[in-house]
């Protein structure tokens, strides 16, 4: 990324300096010295040379940088094409999801075991002799003196 920024900055500065000084000097010299430069080959050669300098100094480095940026952006487009090898953050997220699923499965198994145990245990009569249902019937499991109330 830093290399890309350096290439862009240097290309812009060099391209600006070339365009500013060479074009202005060429235009001024061609306007002032039209009578001196009568050879059309020199003018065409200067324009072609200027175009080649622009191409090699300004356009070519910036186009390669632009292509690199496009490739990086297309390879990091996670919404459309998720990476085949998840990143460290992705691994941590997947581990957390797996742990949550395991905890949910353990809780579900514990609930199922508790339900099975509650279904297999016999129902014990835990009513005391003074409840509304059994106030006239003594409870045989309690070994105390009980009185029947009428």
Swiss-Prot record:
Major location (coarse): membrane
Domain of life: Eukaryota
Keywords: Membrane, Transmembrane, Transmembrane helix
Compartmental location: Membrane
Membrane-protein topology: Multi-pass membrane protein
Recorded GO CC terms: membrane
Sequence intervals crossing the membrane: 4-24, 42-62
Protein name per Swiss-Prot or TrEMBL: Putative transmembrane protein DDB_G0277665
């Amino acid at each position: 990324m830093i290399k890309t920024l350096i290439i862009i900055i240097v290309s812009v500065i060099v391209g600006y300096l070339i365009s500013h000084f060479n074009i202005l000097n060429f235009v001024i010299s061609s306007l002032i010295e039209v009578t001196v430069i009568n050879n059309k080959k020199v003018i065409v050669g200067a324009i072609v040379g200027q175009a080649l300098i622009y191409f090699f100094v300004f356009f070519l480095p910036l186009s390669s940088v632009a292509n690199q940026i496009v490739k990086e952006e297309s390879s990091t487009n996670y919404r459309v094409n998720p990476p085949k090898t998840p990143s460290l953050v992705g691994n941590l997220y997947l581990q957390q999801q797996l742990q949550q699923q395991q905890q949910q499965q353990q809780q579900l198994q514990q609930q199922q075991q508790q339900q099975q145990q509650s279904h297999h245990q016999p129902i014990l009569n835990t009513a005391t002799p003074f409840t509304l249902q059994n106030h006239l019937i003594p409870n045989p499991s309690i070994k105390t003196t009980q009185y029947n109330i009428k």
